[in-house]
Design a protein with these regions (language model features):
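Hydrophobic/aromatic beta-strand elements that line small-molecule binding cavities or substrate pockets
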Residues: 81, 98-102, 115-118, 129-135
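Short, low-complexity N-terminal intrinsically disordered segments enriched in polar/charged residues
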Residues: 3, 14-55
């Protein structure tokens, strides 16, 4: 009977501590991932595409889905962005992410949903939704998969 009491007391004492640690970990994951996205916004709005791309995993295994097309790899993703937003006759506009929902998938993974909007110099506002998978690496949190759609 005494052993049961000890186990019960330990459970009642440790459960809130463990649960609190998990919440703290979730909060730090959410904060770190949101920070990457805010840094991407800032870089984009400076027209710094290389800076924007630091939020992505620099690997041939990065995947980017958009417009029913798969782009594989960091370099190909950078080239896609350059062609779409920095080639002649194109403008990057002002980027804003909103409606972020960041769900930690443990201490080194996160699933992110959100909305994006560009405000272009001509007043147009292309926009859409995205889902991202983030992974924590030794050099920080990086997007390993991006699925972005545009409103029709």
């Amino acid at each position: 009977m005494r052993l049961k009491r000890i186990v019960a007391v330990l459970c009642l004492t440790l459960f809130p501590v463990i649960r609190g640690a998990a919440k703290t970990s979730d909060t730090s994951v959410k904060s770190a991932v949101e920070n990457v996205l805010r840094q991407q916004e800032t870089a984009w709005n400076r027209r710094d595409l290389d800076g924007f791309m630091t939020g992505y995993w620099n690997s041939p295994d990065l995947t980017f889905f958009s417009g029913a097309k798969l782009t594989s790899g960091w370099q190909a993703t950078l080239e896609r962005y350059r062609k779409t937003y920095q080639s002649e006759g194109h403008d990057m506009g002002k980027l804003e992410f909103s409606d972020l929902r960041i769900d930690p998938l443990g201490p080194d993974g996160a699933f992110v949903r959100g909305a994006w909007r560009l405000t272009m110099p001509d007043g147009k506002t292309p926009h859409g939704l995205f889902t991202l998978i983030f992974k924590k690496f030794s050099d920080g949190w990086k997007i390993v998969h991006d699925h972005t759609s545009a409103a029709e």
